[in-house]
Amino acid sequence: MSLRSRAGDWLEDRAGTRSAARWALGEPVPGGARLTYVFGSALLALVLAQIATGFGLALYYSPSEASAWSSVFWIETQVTLGWLLRGLHHHGASVAVVVAALHLGQTLLFGAYRKPRELTWMIGVLLLFLLLAFALTGYLLPWDQRGYWATRVAMSMAATVPIMGGHLERLAQGGEGYGTLTLTRFYAIHAVLLPLVFLGLVGVHLALFRRRGITPPPAVEAGSGRAPRRAWTASGLARRSWTRWSRPRPCSPSWRSP
């Protein structure tokens, strides 16, 4: 027996690694693999990429009114592949929001919000709001004109909340004006608080998802576990559309002869 096999047996005996891997990877997929099942996994991969690129940016970023913009400029011009690092983080955030919207739409179409998956749906919606909070808090961090004025608009909207709006605005911006305290608060929320809450809810979301399984698409035949074959490619859709609309239809005149 090789050293690798012995190490694998030892880990399986102590920690159950092979059993855990079979549980994680041996998930039944109703109707077989399809594009509509990709959005959740793609979103998780994008979130992990955001964490990795965000950690790389945090090594060089300085959350200060005097040095925030210059540190971002340093990352893009002096750090090796810094422009790529920031580009992946910046554009990856936009892609993550789009994929989250697609994932939400897919769950709506499949009825994944119904019993017994209501809690999975509610946590997913909460994760979407947290993702938008990531976008809001991260937009200010470069301390450029777009981030500054976008944050002022967001804080002005927060100030309109009845009773506690003014307190929320002062708490978020660190006083009466915008400056270093605003940056440090947004940075702490963006890099520490939101990731902890987000990853915890992701774990709960995945556990609930694995408990109830994938919601089968409406086209899956009842009791068969598979979907009828359909041509979903561009050429297949074109052929189906042409066949349907080019069929001769009986003429039904709107007039009647005397």
Name what the model sees in each region.
Residues 1-258:
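Membrane-embedded alpha-helical bundles that constitute the cytochrome b-like, heme-associated redox core
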